[in-house]
Amino acid sequence: VADHGARVYGKAEIPLETYEIPLMIYSPKHIAPRQVDTLMTQIDIAPTVLGLLGLPYEAPFFGIDSLHERPARTRVALFSHNHDVAILRDNQLVVLGLGKTHQSLTYDPVAKSFKPRADDAALQGLGVAYFQTASDLFKTNRYN
């Protein structure tokens, strides 16, 4: 796994293609080779590795075990870029900006492009909840 680095670029509010980074887990004596194409972010690495080790994952963090989580759970990705934060779910992106601004977009992963769409109040609320909860847990020292 890697990080997108300092040169995140693009015309988009959140240039998603610069965040696409593969994760490789190599343990040939313990894990059969396979490719898993699922939405996951760096916050999912620890619970995924713990799941591979057969260990429980109970923590106040937002990551999930990307290999063993129930398929019914909808996966989300959280982003921070410049002064904006965003949440992505099922190719629907909501960008939350300064001054309570927001923008709802549909992401086309093949064309790597966005199309504006009607406000998605549910996804916007979920994004606000994730970021506000994380901020509150951090500010009040409850991340342990």
Predicted regions and their residues:
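Solvent-exposed soluble domains appended to multi-pass membrane proteins
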Residues: 1-144
